[in-house]
Regions:
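N-terminal "cap/leader" segments of large eukaryotic alpha-helical scaffolds
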Residues: 5-51
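Structural detector for internal amphipathic alpha-helices that build alpha-solenoid repeat scaffolds
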Residues: 22-31, 49-68, 79, 87-102, ...
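Amphipathic alpha-helical scaffolding segments comprising HEAT/armadillo-like alpha-solenoid repeats
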Residues: 31-43, 67-82, 102-116, 137-152, ...
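Repeat-solenoid scaffold signature
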Residues: 215, 220-233
């Protein structure tokens, strides 16, 4: 354990000898208050994940009850959620849940459900955090059921945040719902967010995103889709696969049909791909 100043508002930062040897920043960070520790380590995680992610996870328990959902911290959370490293996205979620006093327990789901049922502004972020909590293993079935219901709400803003919650939930059920919303939601803004949830945002892994490809290819045959939505489908295919065949539906299908099976259903895990 790295020594911390014995002053109010500071907590010792749990570390390891290996991490201490690698970074002189750790001792300095250990002297900060928990809020600043969390902010600084999340900031470091965006650029130096191997150095800081372990420290974040080892200190989450001691931070709980000492963090505020400040503008700065939430800005860092959103920044980390844009990382290409899924481990960084998970660390951001864990810190956000701690800052909002959401334990990994059914009681937290109940708390969010009450906020969602309210018609106040807090319901929007509650939808987002319900998905995040479900991704961390807390009642994912109930989270999906709630998010699916609100994804079809008459209020477009509610649907928007339910879509964001589905992307954060990041399981196979949410993929199916996001595909349906991409094809069928009446609002272009919602279709765009559904496409983004499938291709880039949220907590789906690369392997999970690939499972959406067959249905995306099926959507290319859907004459009910307008041109803008068809373009979204092509863009989503490109973002997920890294391939580029423009708007040539036949080329996309041929490529997928002959694509290496190991790429369609990868068994070799890439570093940092797991969200565990």
């Amino acid at each position: 354990m790295v020594a911390a100043d014995s002053q109010p508002g500071t907590t010792a930062l749990v570390s390891t000898p290996q991490v201490r040897a690698k970074s002189a920043d750790v001792e300095e960070i250990s002297r900060l208050a928990p809020q600043q520790q969390a902010e600084r380590l999340l900031e470091l995680a965006i650029d130096q994940p191997d150095l800081s992610l372990g420290l974040i996870h080892r200190n989450l328990t001691s931070w709980r009850g000492h963090l505020e959902d400040s503008d700065r911290l939430f800005h860092l959370v959103l920044q980390a959620l844009n990382s290409n490293d899924p481990r960084v996205r998970v660390a951001a979620v864990e810190i956000d849940l701690a800052a909002n006093n959401l334990m990994k327990a059914p009681e937290s789901v109940d708390k969010l459900q009450r906020q969602i049922q309210n018609s106040s502004e807090e319901r929007y972020m509650a939808l987002w955090r319900l998905g995040a909590l479900g991704n961390r293993g807390v009642e994912p079935t109930e989270a999906f059921r709630t998010l699916k219901r609100y994804a079809h709400d008459r209020n477009q803003e509610v649907r928007f945040w339910a879509v964001e919650g589905l992307a954060m939930l990041g399981n196979q059920e949410s993929i199916g719902e996001l595909l349906d919303l991409l094809a069928c939601d009446p609002a272009a803004k919602i279709r765009q967010r559904a496409a983004n949830g499938l291709s880039r945002s949220g907590l789906l892994t690369g392997e999970q995103r690939l499972t959406a490809v067959p249905e995306l290819l099926n959507l290319l045959d859907d004459d009910a889709l307008d041109a803008a939505t068809q373009n979204l489908v092509y863009a989503t295919l490109e973002a997920i696969t890294g391939a580029s065949f423009g708007k040539n539906a036949s080329a996309w299908r041929d490529w997928w049909a002959h694509h290496d099976t190991r790429e369609k259903h990868p068994t070799r895990r890439h570093p940092g791909l797991s969200l565990a």
